[in-house]
Amino acid sequence: MKTLFEEIKASIKNNYNQDRSFWRPVLPWGGVFTIKAGRKAVSCTPLYVEIRLKNTCTIDGFLMLLYVILNENESFPRELSLHFGREFVDCFLYLMDTYSFTTVKLLWIWDKMEKQQYKSEVHKASLVIDLFGNEHDNFTKNLENLMSTIQGSYCSNWHCPTRVQEDQQRTISINPPQEIPHGNLIRLAVDELFCSKIELCEERGCGGLREFSQRVFCHGAPPFVVLNMQHWKPEDLAYVPYYLDLSDHKYLLEGATLFNKEEHHYSAAFQIDGHWMHYDGLRNVNLILLNKPPEFLLLSSLVYIRATEK
């Protein structure tokens, strides 16, 4: 039996223009998990015999991207095991390979999310878990310390009340430049966050110059990074760079997550073997080859994978 990833690659290779869609639904929105309980389950309180998932698009697109990333490089599963745990990575890949889509969502919810990040209630004989919200809250912030970065700075004024500072961040949120210059805006914004620089110290009454060191990853360059782009306007995103330099490492564009404002719904785009695909778990035909970028969708995040060192 072929794995899901092998099936997707085969469908790309054997694709004809008449049919650009994958032959079966992948990670469909929501999900129902039936509990195979014995007789003793009757005495449980509260009693429910199935788990129903709602509004799972806040994790679906990233789960699809994570699956593709883990299959892109043979060293990535081992590296990510250091952050997520070997058991989680092995179980995640097995469940995706075998089309166990509801179970893989439950794996993420119970292993990586905090209880306060989602709503749950017992309705009749079902436990209903609702993931309505923001995908960066439900996924990106739960990536352990994978993308943690740190940047130090010191002020030239010896009397500065906080002369030496350290700024540590667990996620990478890229803000658009306040003044829109010419050139690659995303790369400029990334450089603003990561590169060394000298600025006027913002401490009240200081007046000194603050020198910032290069921002570096706390645990080495991760296999992939997620750039939070939800504060950007479409007109600022005319060009998306296919590679970025982050802390002396080159990263290549692998995919993106997209937001439909009217439906308050997330989807994802990613590439396999140079072909771009669009995944939308809410549609009946939810995995298709792209001729052009999806229209009327806002960019929520960009996902880059670390380039292989030659």
Curated annotation (Swiss-Prot):
Domain of life from the UniProt record: Eukaryota
Any one biological process term the GO annotation gives: cAMP-mediated signaling
Deletion consequences: Conditional knockout in dopamine D1 receptor (D1R)-positive neurons improves working memory, long-term memory, adult neurogenesis in the dentate gyrus (DR) and increases dopamine D1 receptor expression on the plasma membrane. The synaptic plasticity of glutamate neurons in the DG is increased.
S-S bonds: none
Binding partners and assembly: Interacts with DRD1, the dopamine D1 receptor.
Function: Could be a regulator of the dopamine receptor signaling pathway.
PANTHER family associated with the record: HYPOTHETICAL LOC314168 (PTHR35350:SF1)
Protein name, as recorded: Dopamine receptor-interacting-protein 1
